[in-house]
Structures are given as structure tokens and as C-alpha cells.
Amino acid sequence: MTAELREAMALAPWGPVKVKKEEEEEENFPGQASSQQVHSENIKVWAPVQGLQTGLDGSEEEEKGQNISWDMAVVLKATQEAPAASTLGSYSLPGTLAKSEILETHGTMNFLGAETKNLQLLVPKTEICEEAEKPLIISERIQKADPQGPELGEACEKGNMLKRQRIKREKKDFRQVIVNDCHLPESFKEEENQKCKKSGGKYSLNSGAVKNPKTQLGQKPFTCSVCGKGFSQSANLVVHQRIHTGEKPFECHECGKAFIQSANLVVHQRIHTGQKPYVCSKCGKAFTQSSNLTVHQKIHSLEKTFKCNECEKAFSYSSQLARHQKVHITEKCYECNECGKTFTRSSNLIVHQRIHTGEKPFACNDCGKAFTQSANLIVHQRSHTGEKPYECKECGKAFSCFSHLIVHQRIHTAEKPYDCSECGKAFSQLSCLIVHQRIHSGDLPYVCNECGKAFTCSSYLLIHQRIHNGEKPYTCNECGKAFRQRSSLTVHQRTHTGEKPYECEKCGAAFISNSHLMRHHRTHLVE
């Protein structure tokens, strides 16, 4: 090796290298049991490791019998005979990638004698003068030896200095190996798989990113210590545990409301921004969530996905199916002695009989109000505590009862699952349908004791009775005027705000109430 070559190798910048190799005859080395063809293509070298021993198969160094130790590596591209499944020890086969501690340490292929394609070995690299055309190898042994001779020592010291500067600048460890399209014997694969299991998934023969074998099998290795629920990813477990700890790290800057997940915050912020990215292609109605759009689109498609198992009748909504299935429940062995109404469960009969007896065993400690069921008491107590655990994701409105939330959400989805069999009019609540059907039947069960006027709904009777008793519970904060109905107060407040939501389509005149708009329409009819 000439002094110019040594200096070029020592001062060479770090970068990918290609070393040309001439065709050579097969050679035998001590410790070689057998040989087979090794096909290695596109071997790339990229990351820092310590003290790789390499050798030059040149005549000058071969005569001296020297082994040169460098903290560098090369790119090999060779096709030749190599020992099969045998350790080379300290011997070096020119042009062949031998088993090394680099491969062993980083969990990649260290088996010789296999046909390998696209092997990317990420170790440090330097440039070699291609004029020499001398094949370099990575030896089995990784050693640090004092360089022999002053010239070689100076060259190695410069190479080490460049390497240390590179490591300090990058501050990264790129030691990883990717093996693609690797054809290995089954015995070797089994050995490597055992290593993978022992390492807990950190060691993997697979190409690309490291994968945990437990998650590949559909298992859920991350378990909540509170409730025992399992997750396939640790990140999902962290989010889940916030349910138990009450942690809500994602806070809205507009209103201060906090959420467990960032996705919930994004949906919530659309209330303030007014953004509705999910638009119905049929009618143009927009929604803040894709789930609400899906429910809405059933109105247009009339898709009936909920089928009855008894008669195969299909419905668009689960609530419609649940109501229909009551038709098939014929066995009602628990009958009320007072009114003859039957029930499928004795507990339902006991609760029903309290209507006749007037028994209300569940009383509120704050106000003394009593209820026939404990569930009703729990909901009532929230009126004292102010607790509203059920929140609408669309607009953020909260409710003390889950059933109230379900009814409210139909405002956003436009769902009206209760249809009148007489006229086909649909309603979002069953109670509204029952009241409506009394128009057809003429049933007016709620009668005023003062004047004898009857009504289809108890709330209508309550409002009417305020005429007799003079009660006006709804007061305007601006002027102090009081009203018998909340709707009357809402209309009145528009006189202060100037809001006029009802607009005439013909002339553009706007009004504070629908009744005023209807009165205005009559002027156009006269014309």
C-alpha cells in the first residue's frame, strides 16, 4: 500500500462507497467445512460502530502478512463461493461479508451461505480509491489494535478524528439493519424467531419497522390496572386511563371546557367556529361530525338496516325496531288487578301498581319530593347538584338524563322515528306522537277545574291554568316584564336584541315571531 493511498483513505469524507472486485478463483481457508454460492446485491453501509477490522488483499500487504485495523467500513458487491453456515473466526474471505458482531448486535442476518437480495447494512463508511480495485471485507473479529508504523498510525488517527467529529455533529445512532427478500433455511429462521420472542419484540428479522409479535396476533398486551380492559397499543391505554383519573389535558381556549382526547376538542371547537365540514350531497345540509351525516343520509336513501328476527320487517332506526318487536311479545303473565294491564316482568307490575296506590317510596332529602322509582329520584337530585353528565357532542349542551340527550340529538340529525298511522306526520319523541294522535281520536283527558276547558296535553292545561291564577313565572331581565309561557318571553326578548328571524319570501320583510309573519302574508293574499 502506497503512502498516497493511505493518506487518501484517512482523509476521505464519510459517504457511500462502491468497491469494484475482479473475478477470482475459489480458495480454501482453514475451518471451511463446505462451500456454496452467496449472492449479495446492493449492500449499503451507513451507521457508526466501533473498530471494524478490514483487510486489503493486495500483494504488498499479503507479503507482509499485516492486518490493518480501521474504524471505517465499505460497500461490498460480490458474487462468489463462501463458507456455508460456518464461523470464519479470524480468517477473511476477500469480497465476502463475513459473520460479525455488528450483525449479531443489531439483530439482523448473520448466516453465511444464503441467497440474499437488497441487504442494507448500516455501519460507518469511507471512500476507497477505486484505482486499487482491491476487495475489502468485514472480518469476524472486531478489535482495536495499535496501528503498525508511524505512517499508518497517523492515517488512522486522522480517520478516527473525522469519525468523532461526524458523531458529535450528527448526535445520532443509525445502527440498524434492514433485510429484504431474504431466503434463509428454516432452522436459521426458527433460531432468529426465538431471539425475537426473548427480546419482547425489539429484535425482529422482518423488514421495515420493528413490530411486536403480540400485536400481530391480535392480542392486547397493555391492560388497565383499574378495570382490566386490554389494548393493543400503549397510547390507547394512556387515553383510556384518563377516564379513571379524570385528567382532561385538552382545553378549549374559548370557553375553558376540557376533553380527554384531542379529537373531541377539535369537534367541540366547531361550535365556536361554526365549521361544518360534513355536507349532505342530496340536500346540502352540513354537520360537524360524520356520524351525524350518516344518520341524516338515511332519510334520503331510506336504507332499512334494522331487521326484525321474527317477521323480517326492516326499519331505518333501531328505536323503530324496538317499538315493533313489542308486537311479538305476547306472553304477559303479570296482570294489574286495578286496570288489567299486563307486564312481562313482575318488577314492572310492582312499579305500575304504585300509580293506583299513590305510593312513592323514594323521597328527595333536599326538597322532600317523592318518586315511584329510584331512577327518577337520581335524575331529580341532579337538579339540586347541577350535575349534567350527558353532553351533546354537536353543540355542547348537557343534560341530567340520558334519554333527554337522545331526544335532543334528533334536532341535529333530523331523525323523527315516530310516525302517525293516520296522517303520516313524524315526531322526534313518542310523547309528541301520543299527544298528536289525540287530535284524530278526539281524546282530551286534561280538563280545567275552573272553566271546564279540556286539552290533549298536561302542559297545555298547566299554561291555561295560569290565566286563572295569574301566575307569570318567566321574567325579562331587560325590562322586568313577566309572561306565562317561556316562548312568549323568547319572542319579547327579540324586541331588545333586534332579532327578526322570520322573513317574508315575497317582499323581504322580517318579523320577530312566526305569528306576525303569518299575519303579514294575508296582506299579499288580499293584493
From Swiss-Prot:
Segments forming C2H2-type zinc fingers: 222-244, 250-272, 278-300, 306-328, 334-356, 362-384, 390-412, 418-440, 446-468, 474-496, 502-524
Transmembrane spans: none
SUPFAM superfamilies linked to this entry: beta-beta-alpha zinc fingers
Compartments reported by the entry: Nucleus
GO molecular function annotations of the record: DNA binding; DNA-binding transcription factor activity; DNA-binding transcription factor activity, RNA polymerase II-specific; RNA polymerase II transcription regulatory region sequence-specific DNA binding; sequence-specific DNA binding; zinc ion binding
Predominant localisation class: nucleus
Region (Globular domain): 9-221
Cross-link (Glycyl lysine isopeptide (Lys-Gly) (interchain with G-Cter in SUMO2)): K20, K21, K99, K117, K125, K144, K158, K189, K214, K276
This protein's GO CC annotations: nucleus; perinuclear region of cytoplasm
BP GO annotations: cellular response to retinoic acid; regulation of DNA-templated transcription; regulation of transcription by RNA polymerase II; spermatogenesis
InterPro entries assigned to the protein according to its UniProt record, in alphabetical order: Znf_C2H2-type, Znf_C2H2_sf, Znf_C2H2_type
Record region (Disordered): 16-38
Keywords assigned: DNA-binding, Isopeptide bond, Metal-binding, Nucleus, Repeat, Transcription, Transcription regulation, Ubl conjugation, Zinc, Zinc-finger
Family: Belongs to the krueppel C2H2-type zinc-finger protein family.
Purpose: May be involved in transcriptional regulation. Involved in cell differentiation and/or proliferation.
UniProt name for this protein: Zinc finger protein 35
